[in-house]
Amino acid sequence: MSFIDEAKIYLKAGNGGDGCSSFRREKFIEFGGPDGGNGGNGGNIIFYTSHHINTLLYFRYKQHIKAENGNPGSSKKKSGSSGKDVIIKVPIGTQLYDEDGMLITDLNEENQKFIAAHGGKGGIGNANYKTSTNRAPRHFTFGKRGEEKHIILKLKIISDVGIIGLPNAGKSSFLASCTNSKTKIADYPFTTLEPHLGVAFIDNTELVLADIPGLIPGAHLGHGIGDKFLKHIERCSILLHIIDCTLDNIIESYECIRKELSFYNKELSNKTEFIVLNKSDLLDKKEINQKKQILSNHTKKEIFISSIKNNRYPILSTLIKQIHKKYTNTKPHIYDPFNI
């Protein structure tokens, strides 16, 4: 499935139905009086967040969205039926912008609803204008038009852990080993062309990991493909920095990513970081320990070792869970098998 994280769409809420101007006509009743009913309201267009959706792909094929109009009122004081609302499911983390780029709302919670376009109010029938001095009003009102607008949707993935690093560092392999994510894995740069999500369940606790496409120097300026996905890192609680230990200069590799994060958004460089030296099976133990010590002295952080041959799931997933509890104030996602 294609990953779409931006879309521009046209919304047209339903128009309100017109009020009715009519008079009661029955045998032997000479002056039946006004009995025109009200028009129905136009349908709204509502966005609704769901964890079952993780892309804006729907809007590639549906760029014009219209809600039903309200029906007009009729005689015998019958009100017209309201138009049906259009409810559109979007991923958690979807932001709505107007055409000028101003943020309208940020849908960052599960089952959150937002009326993006309000339907028009129904018109008033002449029965409502009857007074003691005006016993036979003919006046009625037309229904109001529904809102009509263009909006821009932008998706920022919400995940517990964002996996970052240079191209071909082994990020996708790490995600696949810790979760059931079916990401493409190959021995060449830019294998990952779009973010991938994986879910790890540890002691009935759910952790969402996001594999972000590889960053290169100048990514914040548009170099490579990482710049369009840097925004997805903003909502990660923890950054998992994967470094290829076979590189000659691992300090340069580390600082390259740190600079790109800082250039894009200074707050990204302040996030809790977890560093992993990957592909350790390609070097002997002495070389690994030397590079681990060099990186540890430079970053003043604990460095963890990983390889494709080692079972990383029990150790690293448990460690990620501990860091998540320690450094975030958010409640962990509790897996509920009945919440489908």
UniProtKB/Swiss-Prot annotation:
Q: Where in the cell is it found?
A: Cytoplasm
Pfam families recorded: GTP1_OBG, MMR_HSR1
In what residue span(s) does the Obg domain sit? Answer: 1-158
Residues binding GTP = 165-172, 190-194, 211-214, 278-281, 306-308
User: Which GO terms of the cellular component aspect does the record hold?
Assistant: cytoplasm
* HAMAP family assigned to the protein according to its UniProt record, in alphabetical order: GTPase_Obg
Query: What protein name applies here?
Result: GTPase Obg
- Organism of this sequence: Ehrlichia canis (strain Jake)
